[in-house]
C-alpha cells in the first residue's frame, strides 16, 4: 500500500495509509523515502519551507497541495484539484497526472516563484503587522497594505529598479528576462551584491534574514505537483 505523508493537518480516508506530522517534524521523519505522496496543508510560505527541507533531504515525492493561505499562488498557477477528489482517486488506484514546478536557491534558502527586497518586502512587512483581529485571516490585510504603500511605491519603484542593491524576481513572468533590477527568468546563476551583511529578503511571502552581502540565485531543482484527480 502506498504511504502518504500529511503535513500540518490530520487526514483520514478509507483505503489509504496517511501519516500526519507538523511541518517542524519533517526533517526527522524516519524512512522519509517510503512516502510516495506528501500533502502540504498551508499557503505558499509553507510550501516553500517544506520544499527546502525535502531539498536538503534529497527526497522527491509527488506533492499534493491543500491550499489554505491567503494568496496560494502555486496552487492557482497549477489549478490544483480539491483534496478530497485527489484522495478518492488515489484510494481507487488511479494514477493522477502531475506537472513540474521549478524551484530556485538563494544562498542557503529556497523559493519557488518570488524573491526580493523591493516593494514586495515592504508589502509583506506591513501586511504581517496588520495580521490581528478581523484582519488575521483572508486577503484584507494585503489589500490594505497595497493601499497604504501605493504612494511610496509610485515614487520609489523607478529608483529601486535602477539600484544595484535592490532586486525582485518573479518567476511566473518568464517572458521578461531582466528589466532593471527586475528578473522574470532564472536560467543561470544571478549574483547580487547588497553591500550589507544583514538583509531581510522576501521569499514566496516569507520574510527571511540572509547574513551575507553577496546573493547567488540559481535553478535548484523541480518538484512534481499533482494537478488532476
Feature-to-residue mapping (PLM):
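N-terminal glycine-/serine-/threonine-rich phosphate-binding loop
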Residues: 1-62
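Catalytic core of DAGKc-family lipid kinases
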Residues: 2-8, 13-14, 56-188
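Short strand-turn-strand beta-turns centered on an Asx-Gly dipeptide
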Residues: 17, 107, 203-205
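Short, solvent-exposed coil/turn segments at beta-strand boundaries
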Residues: 34, 108-109, 163-164, 218-222
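Short glycine/serine/threonine-biased micro-segments
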Residues: 40-41, 114, 203
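Gly/Ser/Thr-rich beta-alpha loop segments that engage phosphate groups in nucleotides
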Residues: 44-47, 69-71, 118, 207
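Short hydrophobic alpha-helical segments that form membrane-spanning helices or hydrophobic packing faces
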Residues: 49-52, 74-76, 212
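ATP/nucleoside-binding phosphotransfer catalytic cores, i.e., glycine-rich phosphate-binding loops
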Residues: 173-229
Amino acid at each position: 500500500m502506498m504511504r502518504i505523508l500529511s503535513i500540518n493537518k490530520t487526514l483520514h480516508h478509507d483505503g489509504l495509509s496517511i501519516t500526519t506530522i507538523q511541518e517542524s517534524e519533517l526533517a526527522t521523519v524516519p524512512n522519509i523515502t517510503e512516502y510516495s505522496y506528501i500533502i502540504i496543508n498551508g499557503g505558499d510560505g509553507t510550501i516553500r519551507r517544506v520544499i527546502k527541507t525535502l531539498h536538503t533531504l534529497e527526497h522527491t515525492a509527488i506533492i499534493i497541495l491543500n491550499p489554505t493561505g491567503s494568496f496560494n499562488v502555486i496552487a492557482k498557477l497549477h489549478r490544483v484539484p480539491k483534496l478530497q477528489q485527489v484522495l478518492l482517486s488515489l484510494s481507487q488506484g488511479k494514477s493522477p497526472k502531475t506537472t513540474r514546478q521549478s524551484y530556485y536557491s538563494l544562498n542557503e534558502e529556497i523559493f519557488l516563484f518570488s524573491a526580493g527586497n523591493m516593494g514586495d518586502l515592504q508589502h509583506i512587512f506591513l501586511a504581517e503587522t496588520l495580521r490581528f483581529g478581523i484582519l488575521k485571516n483572508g486577503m484584507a490585510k494585503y489589500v490594505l497594505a497595497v493601499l497604504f504603500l501605493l504612494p511610496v511605491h509610485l515614487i520609489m519603484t523607478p529608483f529601486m529598479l535602477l539600484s544595484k542593491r535592490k532586486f525582485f524576481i518573479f518567476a511566473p513572468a518568464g517572458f521578461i528576462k531582466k528589466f532593471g533590477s527586475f528578473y522574470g527568468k532564472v536560467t543561470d546563476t544571478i549574483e547580487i551584491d547588497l553591500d550589507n551583511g544583514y538583509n531581510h529578503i522576501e521569499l514566496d511571502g516569507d520574510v527571511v534574514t540572509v547574513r551575507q552581502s553577496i546573493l547567488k540565485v540559481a535553478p535548484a531543482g523541480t518538484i512534481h505537483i499533482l494537478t488532476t484527480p
